[in-house]
Regions:
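Short intrinsically disordered terminal tails
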Residues: 1-2
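Extreme N-terminal leader/targeting regions
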Residues: 5-9
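Concave beta-strand-loop units of leucine-rich repeat
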Residues: 14-63, 69-82, 86, 92-105, ...
């Protein structure tokens, strides 16, 4: 982590304030990330992340203690990780953005995040998306949810039938060879912002 980022994190931790974090290999500051959403007015990641952690910082007790004191609104993971369970502690999280999620086989780390409304994931191999749907069902927020799955192999999408909340955008970039994505994801529902990218 760069020293300026460490100072920003210390200050946010001392105030128990809001912040957003990126995670990359070397901890060099990331000024932002691409925004997949068509309607970007609701994207909170336009001016964030404020702090960038290196992968090794996730094992640093002092740094992670400061992260835990903050209200993390956005988490942008730019590198494959072995373990994503640390995300569970971000109860204020609104935006979770994961590139290179090839080590993700389930979404059990997505829980107790009542404000989560932006979720983007790449390259994961998932059994299902039930934890994400259940998390959003427990939300009191009226904000429309936006989900993006890029080249994710997802065996079972039937949890979408239980999505009794507004989905503003559902973006699917199917893995090569998958052709039944519309039927699998919509399950008879109408989602105005549904797009498949072949």
């Amino acid at each position: 982590m760069e020293e300026k980022g460490r100072e920003i994190l210390r200050e946010a931790a001392s105030e128990q304030g809001y912040t957003s974090i990126a995670i990359n290999k070397d901890g060099k500051h990331v000024g932002g990330c691409f925004i997949p959403w068509k309607l970007t007015s609701s994207a909170i990641n336009m001016k964030t992340p404020r702090v960038t952690l290196a992968v090794e910082d996730l094992q640093d007790e002092a740094i992670m203690a400061d992260v835990k004191k903050c209200k993390v609104l956005g988490c942008y993971i730019m590198i494959p990780l072995e373990d994503y369970s640390f995300v569970q502690q971000f109860h204020e999280l609104c935006d979770l953005f994961i590139l290179y999620g090839k080590n993700i086989s389930d979404l059990s780390f997505v829980q107790d995040m009542p404000n989560l409304f932006l979720f983007y994931l790449e390259d994961a191999k998932l059994t299902d998306i039930r934890p994400l749907i259940d998390n959003c069902r427990r939300s009191n927020s009226l904000t429309g949810k936006r989900f993006g799955f890029y080249h994710c192999e997802i065996q079972d999408t039937s949890a979408m039938k239980d999505a009794d909340f507004m989905i503003s955008e559902l973006l699917i970039w199917p893995p090569e060879g998958q052709t039944d994505e519309k039927e699998r994801w919509l399950n008879g529902r109408h989602i105005s912002g549904f797009r498949i990218y072949d």
